[in-house]
Amino acid sequence: DLKNVFPPKVAVFEPSEAEISHTQKATLVCLATGFYPDHVELSWWVNGKEVHSGVSTDPQPLKEQPALNDSRYCLSSRLRVSATFWQNPRNHFRCQVQFYGLSENDEWTQDRAKPVTQIVSAEAWGRADCGFTSESYQQGVLSATILYEILLGKATLYAVLVSALVLMAMVKRKDSRG
């Protein structure tokens, strides 16, 4: 029944600090929920490239309410990486779910968005063990750049001032001799 077609909601859960400190590994969990029918493909992408190593995905989607014939489905997947790889704030992790829904030709009369075939994804950035995120790293670089420009400007101003004083002293000495 076409009115029961729903695309997934996708979320990525970051690794626990306990796992990282005890095993030196980091497991990201992807959860796709609320979709029907169960025609989906889940993939992990790291820094823009699809990865298969360290990936463990449920063999098939599970019914959220097994007693119902037209129950929506859920699917989970895990990506395990080294703690040091996770703790690099430049690393970008994305869980992508390809949902095979309605085609453009299928008639749709419901008062919600038509659940067409689509890609739904969620993402996370590596998180340094000192609390750095990609955003805080970029903010730090920006602050350092501004500070450097201020110090460079002060040094230039100081050099101009000292040069002017030396020039004035030379002119004054020349005037007093001549």
Swiss-Prot record:
Tell me which domain of life the UniProt entry assigns to the organism this sequence originates from: Eukaryota
Report the record's disulfide bonds: 30-95
Q: Which residues lie on this side of the membrane: Cytoplasmic?
A: 168-178
Q: What are the residue boundaries of the Ig-like C1-type domain, all occurrences included?
A: 8-117
Entry keyword set: Adaptive immunity, Cell membrane, Disulfide bond, Glycoprotein, Immunity, Immunoglobulin domain, Membrane, Receptor, T cell receptor, Transmembrane, Transmembrane helix
Record's InterPro entries? Ig-like_dom, Ig-like_dom_sf, Ig-like_fold, Ig_C1-set, Immune_Resp_Modulators
Q: Which processes are annotated in GO (biological process)?
A: adaptive immune response; alpha-beta T cell activation; T cell receptor signaling pathway
One GO CC term, this protein: plasma membrane
Q: Where are the residues of the annotated region Connecting peptide?
A: 130-144
Q: What are the transmembrane regions? A: 145-167
Q: Which Gene3D superfamilies match?
A: Immunoglobulins
- How does this chain assemble? Alpha-beta TR is a heterodimer composed of an alpha and beta chain; disulfide-linked. The alpha-beta TR is associated with the transmembrane signaling CD3 coreceptor proteins to form the TR-CD3 (TcR or TCR). The assembly of alpha-beta TR heterodimers with CD3 occurs in the endoplasmic reticulum where a single alpha-beta TR heterodimer associates with one CD3D-CD3E heterodimer, one CD3G-CD3E heterodimer and one CD247 homodimer forming a stable octameric structure. CD3D-CD3E and CD3G-CD3E heterodimers preferentially associate with TR alpha and TR beta chains, respectively.
What does UniProt say about this protein's domains? The connecting peptide (CP) domain is essential for signal transmission in response to antigenic stimulation, likely downstream from ZAP70 recruitment.
Which PANTHER family does this UniProt record tie to the protein? TAPASIN (PTHR23411)
Please describe what this protein does.
Constant region of T cell receptor (TR) beta chain. Alpha-beta T cell receptors are antigen specific receptors which are essential to the immune response and are present on the cell surface of T lymphocytes. Recognize peptide-major histocompatibility (MH) (pMH) complexes that are displayed by antigen presenting cells (APC), a prerequisite for efficient T cell adaptive immunity against pathogens.
The protein here is known as: T cell receptor beta constant 2
